Amino acid sequence: MTIKIQFKQTLGETNFDIDLSLPRNEISALFGRSGAGKTTLINVISGLVTPQQGRIAIGDHVLFDSEQGINLPTHKRKIGYVFQDSRLFPHYSVQGNLLYGVKEKDDAYFDAVTDLLSIKPLLKRFPISLSGGEKQRVAIARALLSKPDLLLMDEPLASLDMPRKREVMPFLEELSDKVNIPIIYVTHSLQEILRLAQHLAIIDKGQVTTSGKLEEVWASHAMRPWQSFSDQSSLFEGKIEAHHSQYALTRVKLAPNASLWVQKIDGEPDTPIRLQVRANDVSIALEQPKATSIRNVLPAEVHSIEAFNAGDDKQSINVSLQLDDGCYLWATITPWALDDLNLKVGDKVYAQVKGVSVTQRDVALAPH
């Protein structure tokens, strides 16, 4: 089953025309610049905004249908909502906030949720005594305790400083693995998408510009305007293949005939991971180097060549290199290098990636 969102609405100068299908049991990220319409989209799903026309359904459960006259009120849609700010009741304890609005007592589920988010020690405290990260964990738990069919999260880390973001992120990763509830996650952070999402939809000016599996959208032309020169990268779903105990490196299998040595990753062999390789950390050679400090030298074929203009006379060339069937690596080189190597689509080359260039910030456990 899927989540179907189709509606038209005019708000201010933005004409929304949304037609979006999202998977039922995954984290789907909505990405785009501020004012693109991401929050409006989830407010329509929740019932906080009523569109002029359209249809919204979670599987067979219809929330809104303008033709049939269906418009369930917010409290009957079985949707949990986590806002940018926690919106806790200041005069209630944490436990009081968690139980507010809970219709059926379920001690086992309460224990499971509070354990998952590590907030049991906070139950007797009041919001004024909590850190920003603790407040957001309580807000997430409150949303889960309503036993929703869908969880909406509107930039839940946006108001937190970096230490608090690092505090909350592991709990969000746990959600994707342990909670069997579809999550629609609004963000403008590529790092959060890398760590959390399985599906990605890009929203711009009230329209869905592209939507699909994260790896496919990440590699598409639709992502290029959102990535700076240093952000251009390839995203891989791989598995830990082996560890090199002497040199603190881990070999990651990207495809049957393609592996990378990267800085050591904690995990057992066969652990599925997601790996980001920045395009400006990849170089190209026409012949296999015989003596080099670079640990990864991979045979490849030039798949595509594109010019990239970053403005202010900054020009670069993005080269897509095929490492194996369905496995592609982006390399960013200068126009000078392109001319000097005389690269053409179909050329056999070698991709070089430093083992130290892929660090912990580029690695995440693959969401299930």
From Swiss-Prot:
It is a peripheral membrane protein. It is found in: Cell inner membrane. Its EC number is 7.3.2.5. Keywords: ATP-binding, Cell inner membrane, Cell membrane, Membrane, Molybdenum, Nucleotide-binding, Translocase, Transport. SMART domains: AAA. It comes from Vibrio parahaemolyticus serotype O3:K6 (strain RIMD 2210633). Residues 291-362 form the Mop domain. This is Molybdenum import ATP-binding protein ModC. Pfam families: ABC_tran, TOBE. Transmembrane segments: none annotated. One of its GO terms (molecular function) is ABC-type molybdate transporter activity. The complex is composed of two ATP-binding proteins (ModC), two transmembrane proteins (ModB) and a solute-binding protein (ModA). ATP binds at G32, R33, S34, G35, A36, G37, K38, T39. It is an enzyme of class 7 (translocase). Belongs to the ABC transporter superfamily. Molybdate importer (TC 3.A.1.8) family. One of its GO terms (cellular component) is plasma membrane. Part of the ABC transporter complex ModABC involved in molybdenum import. Responsible for energy coupling to the transport system. It comes from the Bacteria.
